Amino acid sequence: KNPAGTNWYHSHTHELTGAQVYQGLAGMIIISDDVEQKLELPSGEYDLPIIIQDRNFTHDNQLSFNLRRHDRMRGFLGNSILVNGQVNSLIPVKTRAYRLRILNGSNARIYKLGWNDGTAITAIGTDGGLLEKPQNLPYVMLAPAERVELWVDFSGRKPGSELILQSLTYQGTHSTMGRGMMGNGSMR
C-alpha cells in the first residue's frame, strides 16, 4: 500500500515524453491513507491541487513546441506561466486554512515560491509524502517534476484582500541558469 502523498503521472514514451507532457498527457494523483486522515488536514474544497507549467504561445495564441538544439539538451523555457492551465490564474479562497498541493509541471523552469508580503511558507509535505513536522520557510525551491504541500491559513486576512504566491527571482547555480530560468508568473 502506498503512503499518502501528492504524485503525478506522465508519458514515458521514448523520445516523446516532453512533447506529450507539453500537450497535456500528465496530471496529479493524490493518495490518502489512515495516518494522513487522522491529522485532520484541510480536505475537500480546502485541499487545492495546483499545477504550474510554462508554455510557449505563438502570436495567434497557439501552443508551440518547436525545440531548438539548446532546448533539446537542457529543456525549454516557455514565454508564459500557467497555473492549472490558465495564465494569470486567480484562486478565490475563504478565510480559513487550506492545503495547497503544488506540482512543477514545467520542462526545465525552476521556481522559487514565496508569498508577496513575506509571510513564511509552511511546508507540510514533499515528493516523499508528509513531513514529520511542518517547516516554516521564507520560500521553497521547486524543480521540474517536484511537488510540495503547503498549509496556509487565511483566517486572519480581510475578505477581498490578496495574498500572492509568486515565483521570486534568484541566481542560478551555473552560468546559463540565471538567464531566463526565473519564473515571473504568480498565483493569486
Regions found by a protein language model. Name each.
Residues 1, 12-13, 34, 55, ...:
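Short, surface-exposed secondary-structure boundary micro-motifs
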Residues 40-76:
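Compositionally biased low-complexity segments at domain edges in trafficked proteins
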